[in-house]
Amino acid sequence: MDTFFESAWYAARFAAQPNDSMLGEEADHWLPVDHYIGGIEHAILHLLYARFFNLLLRDQNLIQASEPFNRLLTQGMVLADAFYTKDENQNPEWISKERVNTYKDKLTLDDGREVFKDGMSKMSKSKLNGIDPNIMIEKYGADTVRLYMMFTSPPEQSLEWSDTAIEGSYRFLRKVWNLISKRKIYAKEAPQEFTKAELNLRYKSHQTLKEVTNAFAERNSFNTAIASVMELLNAVPDSFKSDDATDSEQYCLDEVIRFTLKMLSPITPHISLFLWKEYSGSDGTDFENSWPIFNEELLKLENFQLIIQVNGKVRGKEIISVSMGQDELENLAKENENVKKILANQPIKKVIYIK
């Protein structure tokens, strides 16, 4: 049979155990498919066939699901620079970038032939502009490659591959490693009181967990989820990471570490699980079978984040009480360390307050 015919209903057949009947009860247990991921071309080909066959199977009482898929994600393409030279008939002859020599902005081959840059285009065998994943994984590790691809672009948009930009993802995972690898889990009871700085970090931790949970479950916004985790780690004060940290500071840092490893685990599973085992001393079963729950009460604290801009650019952020008035907020903004450096005692010409 044609592959379109077979693939149009394979989800129902694969859900059932091998038996004499075409479909078993297992199909009704697993269907419909939670998430369909495929290129945009599937929207006018495979999805139409699949929906037709699903309705046919339903009408024949072979399955109960009215629709074959609950959600659809049409992923973008991975792009990379493509290069070519010309044969004797001036036709393009595609070459891999490894063969290209650069000298004073001129591209050539070893034999002296001129090389032309075609720009970013979809990775393909015909244009020889693909990236060998094994080389990248051997150099950076699978987690770094996965993190880079998820962070660089929303999944439904094209991703422009860069051998240099992936270094940023590698450095971030090194930062995570350096923060957690030599620490052990905080095993004491939760403190009864917290300082303002500690409450600010706890607020940030639970706010980030809420954002990331929603990004994964509802929006497929993997890039914004990763950005939120990066922002959380940047928000940890140095004193919380020092050997002299108080019990309450250690507790807040422990919360950051727990949340960070879980939030990264769908994208960087290897380093996340390894660090959790080292950090917690467990076999990892608890890590793989649970997802943390953000504390709504902490998020309902009478606090909000004050965004401080100077000449239209964000220069500072502060978690403050909603009871503070405009004069208090202005004074707080002026005392922000980064803002003070930028102002350098210059007079402020205009203050815009937006509540």
Which residues does each predicted region cover?
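Short secondary-structure junction motifs
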Residues: Q64-E67, S272, D283, Q346-I348
